[in-house]
């Protein structure tokens, strides 16, 4: 039985040779019968191999993996870690064993000759760690290393040590270099095949008759069954009877064995006779010579062992630099320095030198000697040095730009665009081997320096590129097939273009700061370039947190609309715009969109309602969402001016406005620069605007009050149709992103001493649509005077309202009997003027939710409390307003019922204050211009049925002078309203009254705008243009105000002893700085009600007894009134100025003539702002007995002294009304009430005299007299993107 070895060529090759058993003496003469030890083979050890590079390689892709059949690294005999690596190339795979030091050697060779670490991204292998777990720590590192290397390895590997590490030759065949491999075992005999044999096992050899086999192992003579030998590169077993050994001295005619018996192969007779006749040379010298010639190593083997040194010219660049230890070739360094010093001559690198000088220089460099270039021979023949330099690069086996990167360079240059081409070429250069990269950089910088001397050498960059291109870049495919004709010219073109591009951009391509990060594999930029600050935003001011949140919320509302401002137009475009050309700016922003931001960039002007004489605009669908967004308060110059960049953007969906402590009343001075910044920003914006017909329209609608331009309508929002719009004013359209609140700014009442700029009778030019610059002192809350200035203008007239039944029940449920206390009058002697608030929303009739009822009841309970007669409420600060009637209203209401409750409570409070004012006998100050009023209350409530007793009232009413006492359940509401007015810190206002200078220009006729006829048609109240343009006034002390010009009113019913003191100290207002107030979950409701100022008529009287708890059942519960006595003194100027009567009142029906003053002109109506914000406050029954009402949860100041309570609600003395149906999503409006100026007269039983009440449209009640000659009050309601106007 013969043992077989598993050693074969396809095996690992590192196993030991299995010896065959020996039973006797040697079977071959002179050869022992034991196992032959494997001597040192012809291949050196891996560490002993000299560094060399193959000239040509073609093996394709190589895959390297840690051997999967090995569980982990093992320890070799030298106690070093050994890892198994599976190498796969050209479909064949074999394992190799390598230590960790071998891995580090491979990494060093790779990054010294093949790759740069910036391109390969391979980590440098650290020294081997110490400890027992070193193997487990190195396995993940080597796995990642081999995986990354497999993705990089291609036919670009020409380094001999690297391929030897993988047991590869330059053609992808396995190269066995192990010393103990069976292929390296020397043979003991040679034999030729005499019998054909086919292998029956993988470790057997197959051969044919006549093949030569080298025998490496033979058993004894007695056992001749199996021998082991080599045939070609295969090692295996074969039967011994199939071969015959060659003998050293064969016999004549036969080739016999040494033992005597012939092998049976006869020799030819002619050959044997010939060989026997020629004597063979014998001797030791002849044998040595024959042995040397047979075993002469090849050139490649001599290079591996370091015996043969490659010359400089024709040697691989990486090999030469590795053997010489230099960064760049010595030939290049010496030649470039010499040429830069002496070679600035005409035709350098283009002309050729003397051939003998070139060969002599080459021999010097090949002999590793540096020639003396400064000799006279070379100084006279400088072109020989330049020719030698080109010769060196031309004879490189692999050109400087390598064969492998020829196609990539060609593709990079075909990319369109200079910048992208630069990036692509830079990426290709990074793939060069480090020796090539360093040499290319050195050569290109040298050629770039020579190109700067093109005036002396006539060799600019293009000429140098044409001369050097064939020496630096070549294609292996074109050289192998032999190109000619068009292909040759095409290659020259590609070569010259690439080299010229490298010469032109050498400083950029080889810069350390140049990077292609952020680019995709194709070289396209993935990261957008940041725009310049001046081009991306108009202001360099940092945004506040609120502004950023508002902008973010606005962008979330419209994800499809870009909100990033575009870069401004170029200077040429701006110059074209100044010359009058229609230049479309990027982003669609222009000066006109600054006024129309809230209404959208393409929303046309809406037409008036049908009952105003116009055509109705198509109503908005009820299910549609308003295309607006809530704007927060703008509290500074920066916040006003920073939003001009948002003009022209798409409307954003309205979001929930965050509550703050500045929602209701101001208690501190407002920033002085607010209005000025707005005016200045508008003026600066107008410098680049273009004049068009729409400019006058925008200016008249948005800035008519400030600029004095003519107006086309009398009401602020009469031209909005029935589509409710709560966008900001047109002049403040740029403030959309700031959550702007129109009620923030207030202006103080005018002072008689302040001069008003007279208005020119001629209409202003349409182009001057921007307001004049306003000084901070003109809009200061307190004016330039001392703090003793009078209080802000306030509403103190009776109010007839229409309240839904649900609100009336809640108001009645929250009341309880309590003693009434007087309220100090804010303006002594002010005439009482009625204001009508019709309920215009159909949704107001809907029942309130439980949460709303609880809020209202709780606030009504918490606001009541006994007030002493000696206590007085602090005066509210003078308001400031930058709004005009032409501006857009505040955000849309969310709950009409809560709105009405707010308005009723505030009106009742003002009426009570007016009563106390008249009881004191004071004279109301005279106002010279109309003003706009703002109400902002927060009313809470409790569920129905939680109140004490008494039926719920139907409306909030103020008793007349004949009423002995107020109802017991109303003081709470008045207390609540006064409390809220007294707790607002200064500087935190979000509501504001409108000052005299903000009167809309549409209310002044006579002007020349193109909308003047339309304004006259839309507005029933037109005023002449001779009215002086009011300016910004500051309040003056009360004693400076002139008395009323009319008959004084009789005193109203006193709620208590008068406690008003004209010389009372000014209230102390706390700073707005402090802990933030808790946010209110209630919704804010805003209304503006514009009514004619100075109405000298009194409110309707009641036909029932003032002591009755409920009005008669025949009265409609949807209407309410506030009784008021006629004035006792002469009315002020602005109260005696009325516009002409509307067309709805025929002249023959006007039985009452209002007093007119010849020197006064009619004034526009004033809007009434109403804000309702209900907070989630629970009922507090104990608060009714407290001496001081509790502070509002959103207030940051002290509650202040107690305030009186509200008067009793009453019903209006008429029957059920017929609703006026109006198509639209919000339902029909309520009929309006008109009053006569005659004092109220009650008959027996409190019956109302006939002829004291009127309805709108000229409809009279039973026995009604003619309507008054003044126009009816005007209302305009904005909600959910729609607007309704009433007159």
Swiss-Prot record:
Q: Where is the composition biased (Pro residues)?
A: 752-766
Give the top-rank taxon of the lineage listed in the UniProt record for this protein: Eukaryota
Enumerate the spans annotated as Rho-GAP domain.
Answer: 315-510
Record has GTP-binding as a keyword = no
Region labeled Disordered — which residues?
1-40, 551-792, 813-832, 859-1030, 1056-1075, 1090-1134, 1146-1287
* Matches recorded under PROSITE patterns: RHOGAP (PS50238), SH3 (PS50002)
List, in alphabetical order, the GO biological process terms annotated in this UniProt record.
protein transport; regulation of dendritic spine morphogenesis; regulation of postsynapse assembly; response to toxic substance; small GTPase-mediated signal transduction
The chain residues annotated with the modification Omega-N-methylarginine are: 1244
Where does the record place the modification Phosphoserine?
8, 570, 636, 727
Annotated positions for site Arginine finger: 350
Print the keywords alphabetically.
Answer: GTPase activation, Methylation, Phosphoprotein, Protein transport, SH3 domain, Transport
User: Which residues are reported to carry the modification Phosphotyrosine?
Assistant: 1169
Specify residue ranges for compositional bias: Polar residues.
622-645, 972-981, 1019-1028, 1274-1287
Which residues are in coiled coils? none
- What is the purpose of this protein? May be involved in several stages of intracellular trafficking. Could play an important role in the regulation of glucose transport by insulin. May act as a downstream effector of RHOQ/TC10 in the regulation of insulin-stimulated glucose transport.
Give the similarity note. Answer: Belongs to the PX domain-containing GAP family.
Q: What do we know about how this protein assembles, alone or with others?
A: Specifically interacts with CDC42 and RHOQ/TC10 through its Rho-GAP domain. Interacts with NEK6.
Official protein name in the record: Rho GTPase-activating protein 33
């Amino acid at each position: 039985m013969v043992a077989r070895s598993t050693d074969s060529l396809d095996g690992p090759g590192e196993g030991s040779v299995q010896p065959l058993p020996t039973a006797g003496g040697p079977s071959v003469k002179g050869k022992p019968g034991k196992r032959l030890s494997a001597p040192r083979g012809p291949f050196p050890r891996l560490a002993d191999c000299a560094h060399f590079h193959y000239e040509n390689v073609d093996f394709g892709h190589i895959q390297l993996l840690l051997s999967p059949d090995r569980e982990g690294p093992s320890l070799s005999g030298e106690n070093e870690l050994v890892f198994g690596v599976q190498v796969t190339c050209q479909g064949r795979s074999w394992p190799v064993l390598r230590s960790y030091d071998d891995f580090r050697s491979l990494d060093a060779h790779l990054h010294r000759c093949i790759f740069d670490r910036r391109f390969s991204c391979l980590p440098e292998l650290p020294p081997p760690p110490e400890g027992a777990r070193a193997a487990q720590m190195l396995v993940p590192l080597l796995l990642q290393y081999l995986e990354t290397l497999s993705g990089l390895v291609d036919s670009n590997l020409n380094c001999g040590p690297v391929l030897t590490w993988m047991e590869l030759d330059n053609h992808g065949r396995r190269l066995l270099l192990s010393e103990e491999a069976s292929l390296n075992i020397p043979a003991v005999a040679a034999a030729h095949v005499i019998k054909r044999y086919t292998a029956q096992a993988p470790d057997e050899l197959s051969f044919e008759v006549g093949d030569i086999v080298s025998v490496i192992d033979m058993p004894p003579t007695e056992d001749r069954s199996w021998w082991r030998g080599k045939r070609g590169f295969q090692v295996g077993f074969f039967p011994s009877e199939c071969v015959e050994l060659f003998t050293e001295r064969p016999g004549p005619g036969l080739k016999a064995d040494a033992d005597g018996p012939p092998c049976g192969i006869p020799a030819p007779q002619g050959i044997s006779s010939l060989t026997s006749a020629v004597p063979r040379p014998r001797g030791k010298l002849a044998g040595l010579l024959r042995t040397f010639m047979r075993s002469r190593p090849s050139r490649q083997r001599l290079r591996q062992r370091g015996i043969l040194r490659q010359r400089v010219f024709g040697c691989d660049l990486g090999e030469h630099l590795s053997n010489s230890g230099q960064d760049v070739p010595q030939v290049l360094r010496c030649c470039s320095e010499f040429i830069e010093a002496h070679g600035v001559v005409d035709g350098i690198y283009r002309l050729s030198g003397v051939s003998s000088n070139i060969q002599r220089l080459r021999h010097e460099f090949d002999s590793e000697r540096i020639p003396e270039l400064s000799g006279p021979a070379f100084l006279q023949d400088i072109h020989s040095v330049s020719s030698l330099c080109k010769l060196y690069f031309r004879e490189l086996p692999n050109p400087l730009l390598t064969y492998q990167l020829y196609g990539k360079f060609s593709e990079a240059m075909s990319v369109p665009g200079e910048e992208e081409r630069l990036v692509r070429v830079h990426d290709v250069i990074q793939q060069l081997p480090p020796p090539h990269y360093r040499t290319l950089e050195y050569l290109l910088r040298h050629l770039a320096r020579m190109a700067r001397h093109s005036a002396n050498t006539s060799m600019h960059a293009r000429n140098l590129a044409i001369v050097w291109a064939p020496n630096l870049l070549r294609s292996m495919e074109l050289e192998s097939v032999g190109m000619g004709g068009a292909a040759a010219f095409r290659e020259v073109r590609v070569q010259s273009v690439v080299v010229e591009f490298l010469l032109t951009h050498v400083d950029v391509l080889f810069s350390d700061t140049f990077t292609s990060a952020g680019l995709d594999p194709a070289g396209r930029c993935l990261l957008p370039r940041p725009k310049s600050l001046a081009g991306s935003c108009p202001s360099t001011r940092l945004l506040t947190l609120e502004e950023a949140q508002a902008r973010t919320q606005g962008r979330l509302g419209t994800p499809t609309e870009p909100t990033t401002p575009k870069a401004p137009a170029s200077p040429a475009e701006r110059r074209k715009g100044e010359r009058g050309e229609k230049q479309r700016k990027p982003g669609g922003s222009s000066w006109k969109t600054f006024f129309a931001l809230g209404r959208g960039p393409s929303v046309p002007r809406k037409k008036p309602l049908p009952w105003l004489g116009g055509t109705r605009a198509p109503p908005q669908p009820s299910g549609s969402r308003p295309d607006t967004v809530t704007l927060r308060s703008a509290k500074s110059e920066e916040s006003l001016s920073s939003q001009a960049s948002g003009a022209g953007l798409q409307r954003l969906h309205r979001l929930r406005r965050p509550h703050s402590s500045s929602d209701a009343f101001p208690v501190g001075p407002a920033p002085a620069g607010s209005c000025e910044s707005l005016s200045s920003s508008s003026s600066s914006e107008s410098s680049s605007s273009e004049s068009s017909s729409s400019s006058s329209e925008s200016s008249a609608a948005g800035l008519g009050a400030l600029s004095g331009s003519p107006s086309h309508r009398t009401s602020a929002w009469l031209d909005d149709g029935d589509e409710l719009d709560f966008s900001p004013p047109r002049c403040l359209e740029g403030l959309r992103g700031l959550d702007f609140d129109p009620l923030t700014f207030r202006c103080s009442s005018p002072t008689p001493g302040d001069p008003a700029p007279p208005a020119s009778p001629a209409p202003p030019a349409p182009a001057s649509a921007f307001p004049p610059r306003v000084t901070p002192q003109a809009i200061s809350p307190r004016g330039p005077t001392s703090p003793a200035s009078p209080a802000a203008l306030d509403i103190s007239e009776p109010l007839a309202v229409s309240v839904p039944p649900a609100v009336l029940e809640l108001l009645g449920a929250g009341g309880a009997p309590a003693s009434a206390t007087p309220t100090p009058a804010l303006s002594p002697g002010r005439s009482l003027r009625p204001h009508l608030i019709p309920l215009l929303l159909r949704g107001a009739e809907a029942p309130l939710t439980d949460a709303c009822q609880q809020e209202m009841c709780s606030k009504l309970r918490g606001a009541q409390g006994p007030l002493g007669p000696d206590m007085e409420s602090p005066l509210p600060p003078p308001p400031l307003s930058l709004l005009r009637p032409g501006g857009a209203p505040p955000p849309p209401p969310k709950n009409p019922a809560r709105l009405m409750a707010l308005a009723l409570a505030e009106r009742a409070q003002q009426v009570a204050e007016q009563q106390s004012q008249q009881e004191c006998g004071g004279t109301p100050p005279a106002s010279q211009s109309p003003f706009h009023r703002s109400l902002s209350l927060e009313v809470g409530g409790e569920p129905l049925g939680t109140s004490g007793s008494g039926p719920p009232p139907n409306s909030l009413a103020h008793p007349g002078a004949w009423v002995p006492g107020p109802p017991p359940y109303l003081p709470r509401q008045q207390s609540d309203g006064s409390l809220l007015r007294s707790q607002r810190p200064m500087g935190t206002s979000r509501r504001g009254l409108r000052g005299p200078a903000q009167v809309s220009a549409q209310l002044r006729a006579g002007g020349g705008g193109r909308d003047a006829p339309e304004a006259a048609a839309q507005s029933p109240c037109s005023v002449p243009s001779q009215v002086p343009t009011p300016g910004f006034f500051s309040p003056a002390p009360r004693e400076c105000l002139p008395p009323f010009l009319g008959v004084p009113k009789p005193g109203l019913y006193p709620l208590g002893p008068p406690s008003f003191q004209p010389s009372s100290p000014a209230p102390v207002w706390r700073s707005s700085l402090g802990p933030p107030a808790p946010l209110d979950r209630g919704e804010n409701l805003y209304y503006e009600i514009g009514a004619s100022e100075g109405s000298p008529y009194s409110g309707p009287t009641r036909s029932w007894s003032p002591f009755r708890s409920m009005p008669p059942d025949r009265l409609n519960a949807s209407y309410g009134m506030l009784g008021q006595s006629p004035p006792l003194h002469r009315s002020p100027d602005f109260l005696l100025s009325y516009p002409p009567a509307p067309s709805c009142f025929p002249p023959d029906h006007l039985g009452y003539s209002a007093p007119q003053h010849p020197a006064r002109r009619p004034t526009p109506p004033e809007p009434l702002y109403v804000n309702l914000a209900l907070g989630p406050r629970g009922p507090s029954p104990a608060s009714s007995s407290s001496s001081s009402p509790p502070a509002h949860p959103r207030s940051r100041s002290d509650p202040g002294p107690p305030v009186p309570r509200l008067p009793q609600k009453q019903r209006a003395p008429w029957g059920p009304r017929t609703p006026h149906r109006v198509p639209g999503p919000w339902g029909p409006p309520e009929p309006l009430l008109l009053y006569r100026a005659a004092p109220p007269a009650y008959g027996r039983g409190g019956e109302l005299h006939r002829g004291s009440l009127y309805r709108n449209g000229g409809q009279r009640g039973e026995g009604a007299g003619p309507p008054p000659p003044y126009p009816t009050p005007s209302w305009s309601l904005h909600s959910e993107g729609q607007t309704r106007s009433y007159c």
